[in-house]
Amino acid sequence: MELLSTIRIFSSPNMKDLLIQLSQGKVIIYPTESVFGLGCDPDNKNAISTLLKIKNRSWKKGLILVAANYTQLLKYIDDSCLNETQRSRVFSTWPGPMTWVFPAQANRSYWLTGQFSSVAVRVSHFEPIQRLCLAFGKPLVSTSANLSGQLPARTIEEVHDQLGYKIPIMHEDILGRPNPSKIRDVMTGKLIRE
């Protein structure tokens, strides 16, 4: 019942259906700041496995989590080793299109971190992502909606061309940023992806 009252607050043409799909361990497609994203429940190993198969992506690469707020990420990251300068650097870019690679919690799931002991996370300012993560109550796995090695999809037509018609899509437009989020290491500030 609580889920249904939450859905009414966050209006989107098919929000209720998307939340049901996520809670059942399914993969969805949703708009991000620059491209369409494939997403699923970060706590559901089968959902992540399905996402990796759809994308034809190796589990070793790890995945990004996108959240509505910092609190949603605390289950997945270990921020205890950050000093004030590092914290300030992160919070000066969030919410926004900056992904930070944090040390992962000790009980991390290898299907999120891949071969690494870290996890990439982002707090988005983009309203559709905010609504989706708040309504779902946790972050989403976030990777571009395309086959590995192909260009990321910027339109629903491009999504259908690469991934077909079986995955439910959040019917809203991308924000239109020209590039995916930058990725930086939280400990060093080093740029990993421009």
Swiss-Prot record:
One Pfam family cited in the UniProt record for this chain: Sua5_yciO_yrdC
InterPro entries assigned to the protein according to its UniProt record, in alphabetical order: DHBP_synth_RibB-like_a/b_dom, Sua5-like_dom, TC-AMP_synthase, TC-AMP_synthase_SUA5
YrdC-like domain location: 12-194
UniProt-listed SUPFAM superfamilies: YrdC/RibB
This enzyme's EC code(s): 2.7.7.87
Alphabetical keyword list: ATP-binding, Cytoplasm, Nucleotide-binding, Nucleotidyltransferase, Transferase, tRNA processing
Name recorded for this polypeptide: Threonylcarbamoyl-AMP synthase
Residues making up the signal peptide according to the UniProt record: none
Function, in words: Required for the formation of a threonylcarbamoyl group on adenosine at position 37 (t(6)A37) in tRNAs that read codons beginning with adenine. Catalyzes the conversion of L-threonine, HCO(3)(-)/CO(2) and ATP to give threonylcarbamoyl-AMP (TC-AMP) as the acyladenylate intermediate, with the release of diphosphate.
Source species, domain of life: Bacteria
Compartment list: Cytoplasm
Organism of origin: Blochmanniella pennsylvanica (strain BPEN)
Gene Ontology MF annotations: ATP binding; double-stranded RNA binding; L-threonylcarbamoyladenylate synthase; tRNA binding
Entry GO CC: cytoplasm
